[in-house]
Amino acid sequence: MSTTPFAGIADFYNQRVQTYGYDPRACDYGRAESQRRKFSVLASATDYNGLSVLDVGCGFADYAGFLAERHPGIEYHGIDLSPAMIEKARQARPDLDLRVANLFDLPSDEFYDVVSANGIFYLLGTEAPALMRRLVSEMFRRCRRGVVFNSLSTWASVQEQGEYYADPLEVVAWCRELSPWVVLRHDYLPHDFTVFVARQSSLP
């Protein structure tokens, strides 16, 4: 797998950690309230109680605490491209399994109940459409129950230059090639959407 644009993304976040330290600004989150809404939607995708979760692009692993408060008994694992992010995250949460790793480089037999990603696609550059699809496909390959991820949306009325905005309906279309059980949420922020792709129906 090519290191581009992953090396550049790692450098971007390493620099932000150097600038801001252990601070939400290092994660390029924007407003705390918008991040809380994103976490809330991700956490509502399924009943996580007792499940293993891989958080791809975990940053400071803030999502771990958010999940644990709402879903006791989860087994959280986090990976991130940025060594600086993981170093700070380990200092704050030494109890968690946190690694510097690229999703594509994990052992082929490493699986989790749910694979999650929050805000990892917007810096993918010109390769973004194809690479987003490859990343989600790899996430789905490694899940037992489902994957949940969010992205900036082309439905946003204002878009930041240089950031990737995905078309929600196009994303749903190729997610349906992975599974017929797909949920789209575009009701919590005007510029963001979340997709949950399950291996089987959530209804009895």
Place the predicted regions along the sequence by residue.
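N-terminal, positively charged/glycine-rich alpha-helical extensions of SAM-dependent methyltransferases
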Residues: 1-23
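Conserved alpha-helix/loop element of class I SAM-dependent methyltransferases that forms part
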Residues: 32-49
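Class I SAM-dependent methyltransferase SAM/SAH-binding core
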Residues: 54, 60-105
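A conserved beta-strand element that flanks and buttresses the S-adenosyl-L-methionine
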Residues: 116
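A short, conserved alpha-helix within the catalytic core of class I
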Residues: 124-136
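Conserved beta-strand signature within the Rossmann-like core of class I S-adenosyl-L-methionine
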Residues: 143-153
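Short alpha-helix
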Residues: 163-179
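Core SAM-dependent methyltransferase catalytic element
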Residues: 186-204
